[in-house]
Amino acid sequence: MATYLVGDLQGCYDELQLLLETVQFNPVQDKLYLVGDLVARGDKSLECLRFVKSLGAAAQMVLGNHDLHLISTALGIKKVSLQDHVEAIFTAPDFVELIDWLRHQPLLVHDEKCDFVMSHAGISPDWDLDTAKSCAREVENELQHGDYHYLISNMYDNQPDRWSADLQGLQRLRYSINVFTRMRFCYRDHRLDFACKASVEKAPQELIPWFNLDNPLFKVQNLVFGHWASLVDTPTPANIYALDTGCVWGNRMTMLRWEDKQYFVQGALKDYF
């Protein structure tokens, strides 16, 4: 049995399949973890959704910002982004089933046996693990059981940009969604920045990668995330695993076998733009 973790798919279905062939993935005995953003700019988002769903218990994903945006467009709240290639999803006979399955996926996964925590974008520098798990469950409960139309309609905002235990209701949920699915850089006072998507080397000096801020959790816990393609080839602390290496941007898709920490890569098969 082996545990594999893979970076953002973004509709790059063929590259995923080649990686799974390379590692001889066996869904009967192996487990595949996905850091989110199954859909968006690649041309096989529908295939990615169907495949991951078909794996059942052999796969575990977390929701990314593009996955949430797909739910939003499915509800008619937002329009499909011009760069996204998700049209086939909306005309698929299993469209409703796929969207319902997607909104039942978590924002955070803690595999205690393998000793890693996975989310799409990261963990707030102001959270310990219990707080992170609690905040994730609060959002998941709304998406899965509550008035998720209201939540999805009101999640598009950059405020609040700083954590407080006193946050309640929509403010608290929105902060959590932004941390789990959108965060990259923070200021020294832990305020979230959403403007900069650059590499660490090219970012303004006042911005700090979230995982380099002072949080005891970041020093002891294995953290796995995607979302940040411009981090490719940028060193991170030994316990921080950044798996989005920009396949949809013409770079490569990266898969990590957890047991021996061996990486497998597959270059982009085409220019998606």
UniProtKB/Swiss-Prot annotation:
Q: Indicate yes or no for the key word Membrane.
A: no
Catalytic activity as recorded in UniProt? P(1),P(4)-bis(5'-adenosyl) tetraphosphate + H2O = 2 ADP + 2 H(+)
What UniProt keywords apply to this chain's record, in alphabetical order?
Hydrolase
| Top-level EC class as recorded in UniProt | hydrolase
User: Single GO molecular-function term?
Assistant: bis(5'-nucleosyl)-tetraphosphatase (symmetrical) activity
The EC number of this protein is: 3.6.1.41
What's this protein's family per the entry?
Belongs to the Ap4A hydrolase family.
HAMAP family tied to this protein:
ApaH
NCBIfam families per record: apaH, PRK00166.1
Please give the function described in this protein's UniProt entry. Hydrolyzes diadenosine 5',5'''-P1,P4-tetraphosphate to yield ADP.
Protein name stated in the entry: Bis(5'-nucleosyl)-tetraphosphatase, symmetrical
Q: Which organism is it from?
A: Histophilus somni (strain 2336) (Haemophilus somnus)
